[in-house]
Amino acid sequence: MDALMANYGSDSDDDNEPATVAGGAPEPQEASVLLPPPPLDLLQPPNFVDYSTIAQGSRIRSFPHVEGNYALHVYIPVVIPFNARKQLTLVMRRAASLVPDLYAVDADYALSELCKDEQKLEKVLLGREFHVSLGRTVGIQVHQIDSLVAMLRQKFQSQQRYWMEFNKWEHFVNDDSTRSFLSLEVTRTGLPEISKQIHMVDEVYRLHGLPEFYKNPRPHISLAWALGDVSSKLKQATKEIEKFENSINSSKNCNLRCNFSRIVCKVGKKVYDICKIGD
């Protein structure tokens, strides 16, 4: 998840060379006086949040690393609307009390620790970008990248905006049972459109010899995860969450609606826009 950082030599590296006077002898330089660094508190804004103090979970690669291969993921980016975050904050606090060993997806911080500070919970968990997967996350070779991206862009060149409603709390387990997820699923509004887009991605995957998506796809965003298969815990937790949600909201289900506006293809650390619908 962390971006790779590349170090480049400065264009002004030569400025650090000793000056040369006539005759070729280097001119002696005065020893510089090193000042002590300023207090760290002065370098931090008033609303600074130190996320490094929060316990982190263990990361597990979902497929073996192969030299020369890059992880491919095609998805719809989702940002939770501000008007839905207050209720979700309450729900995630409830989830953390029901399943203490949950972690925030991608951020990988312990949910129970995040819940101690509302600012941390909203910034680390709810303020990030989520995704609805349109294809399996698989490894591809470098020579496949250009062809795959070009075909995806051609497939999705005439997409239109539509609504997605994440209306059902559900739990999922990955293929090798190393992780379980607490998720919000799309079961009504937006399901036909997303299912069609998954089929289109499958067609491109098939042409590149890649495994297709699940036979009966269930579009969702995952908010938290736990190590191993904890289906029984999460199944019971989703029932309790629905009861809790009904007690604080007159509507029957979670009212999280987002507009579809973009599809992204991530290969390794590089992100390609497949389609983007303007306002």
Place the predicted regions along the sequence by residue.
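Histidine-dependent nucleotide/RNA phosphoesterase domain, centered on the 2H-phosphoesterase fold
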Residues: D2-D279
